[in-house]
Amino acid sequence: MKPQLLTPLRRRPWTCRQCLQRLQRLQQQTRRSFETAASPAPGHTQVDYIPADASQSKKVDDETIRRVFDSQHFWREFSQRRSTQSKPTGLVQNQYLTSPDGFRTFANVSLQKCQAIVSKVLAASTLEEYRTMARDLDRLSDLLCRVIDLSDFIRVIHPDPRVQEAATQAYALMFEYMNVLNTTTGLNDQLKKAVANPEVASHWTEEEKIVAQILIKDFSNSAILMPPQERQRFVNLSNDISQLGSSFVNSPEPAKSQVVVNANSLRGLDPMLVQQIKRWNRTASVPTTGMIPRLALRSVHDESVRREVYLASRTSSARQLHRLEELLLKRAELAKLSGYSSFGHMTLSDKMAKSPEAVSNFLTSLVDSNRTLVREELLQLRNMKGSPLQPWDHAYYVHKRVMQYSQSRRSRELSAVPEFFSLGTVMQGLSRLFDRLYGVRLVPQEAAPGETWNPDVRRLDVVDEADRHIAVIYCDLFSRPNKHPNPAHFTLRCSREISATEVAECASLDQSSHPNDGMATAVDPTTKTLRQLPTIALVCDFAEPAAHGGRPSLLSEHSVRTLFHEMGHALHSILGQTRLQSISGTRCATDFAELPSVLMEHFATAPSVLSLYARHWETDEPLSERMIQSMERDRTAHGSIYGAVENEAQILMALVDQEYHSRPADGGRIDSTALYHEVAQRHSSLPDPAETAPPTSWQGFFGHLYGYGATYYSYIFDRAIANKLWADVFGAGRAAVDRAAGERYKTEVLRWGGGRNGWQCVAGVLGPSNASNADGRLVEGGDEAMREVGRWGLGRDGVSG
């Protein structure tokens, strides 16, 4: 998450270098003890993907990571060994979180530290005090984030209601305090004095300068500079927007809840579903929300029924449209109050795009680059129908084409693909890939009692080529009752340099006190300073392995890509270790944050990467070249059926988002339906008919208009950049495991976190010889750079059946 000024988004007890060396020796002994248990099953053909000069412990780690995810028996032995030898610890090693009451202590201790920093900043008067101000405020932000980010995660993921409630209270306490700080004018005044003083700013590192500007921007966004009356209006508008947005997202409603048709006209729809919705008088009530209308549009043969269901399912209630239009008006007024011409201009001012005009340039350029592919797809569907295609025909004829393809091309091989994608082999493949590209790998680590929130959570330590510990990942990947099903990456604590002053302060407070609350730290070998290491949680909802041997959790190709996507976010956190937490890892511009994760999806099915991990769970046979080619043909075939039209739909949504949020505050009431149809008529190849009464108003179901207001373009923007990097840096897969390509990407993009302008990252990784970056045209960004990214296009990648 990113609150304003002090922005939240994690460590074993602090030790000296000698202690770290002892710990490494202990880890090596532990790994050796598992060497026998981790060996391949008898009869398996073992192909060694580890370099010949690799250490024995590295080979054991490589096999162990597969077993801890695939074998419940092995996992029980592995996890219980630490449980019988270690003292209990707190959640994610946080020394306070050994019980629900610990959340209150954690929040209060952090609050006291925050208050001490605030007092120091407000009292600053000497040159030296102003020179430490950027770091002081970054530490203040970190203290808030420590509580807010971790509590926010635990209250959602922990199965114990008492822990959930305690985490919620800690979250609320610190969030309320953060809001107080965001309106503390003295902090803003002092920071501005520091920035304006050349004798201060000249002593700051580039990171400190960037963080200072970020904090000033955050203060500005909280209306801190406004007179009291205007500030109160700002607060009121913000509250109104929050309430309207929540209602808009949580209460979508169609104008009609159902469409009544003759039951006999539903031929093609599953007869069991027809029976569920059939009424006594031979009619059927087709609901206009949920799965049934989507299935009807795919399968009902009668075009008139499809038309009626389509129009009704895309027409919102007047009440829902009123919520949206009030939300847009309030946002426009908020922007005007803040000195911006529109909400889009306010939101985009610190993004790569900078302005709504630049986003529109990107999107219209993307429409042009996608148009030929769309026409090809629609022509194929029109030929199937034999007459002009209508919007309500698309899903129906796409489904027919997919079924034809499946019957004619899909072989038994494709249905067997998940047999080669056990969760353990995929995690093993990720570790091998990271080792090849970036010189880091994933090492299973036994968690201490109390460290994880559920017994099936696996802990992975990330280590570099010198076996130095650089990050912690908690993998909560298996399904359980009441667990949120959506895959996600959470940064529980950002990386950051811990000053000697903080270490001394901790020692003076309490013998048991720890400068990182007990969570993972390491000594930087270059600067000899203590660092808090990034601590990450990956959450998915995969099936558990069989309890007593047998079949592990097998993933579909889509699930493999999802896991690679989330690990792309984690990689950004792992390698983007800055000295200040405000710009570490994924804390970058919204329209740059998805680049590492989207790019990682390309690696998932690249042949050279598949050779690192895709092996049959039972026989250990590798995925054959023929099967890899079949997967590629399958993706290409599905992409050619509907990939470009799906891309156009995403582009259209982004254009609608920009149109809504670029309206000036004094432009009067917004007719969201008229604007939606104007955009669709200009840019959609298959727009909704505008002459129906009432006209369709699909925008009422577009919940992302609240959460991603003015930034919905970000994902497809990063997709376009990722496609370019995949082609030009990683050779469209030919250099997918090439160390030079990986180092180039790490050096120019990942290691900076949010400490470098995104355009500089893109220009740097492409290099000056790349035609798209001729004369360094991308470095400064701007309208033409946005158009250039639009010309790169989206292709049809990412589509699989």
Swiss-Prot record:
EC number, UniProt record: 3.4.24.59
GO BP, sorted A to Z: peptide metabolic process; protein processing involved in protein targeting to mitochondrion
Enzyme class: hydrolase
Active site feature: E566
Keyword Mitochondrion: yes
Domain of life: Eukaryota
Record-stated family: Belongs to the peptidase M3 family.
Function: Cleaves proteins, imported into the mitochondrion, to their mature size. While most mitochondrial precursor proteins are processed to the mature form in one step by mitochondrial processing peptidase (MPP), the sequential cleavage by MIP of an octapeptide after initial processing by MPP is a required step for a subgroup of nuclear-encoded precursor proteins destined for the matrix or the inner membrane.
Protein name per the record: Mitochondrial intermediate peptidase
Classification lineage: Eukaryota, Fungi, Dikarya, Ascomycota, Pezizomycotina
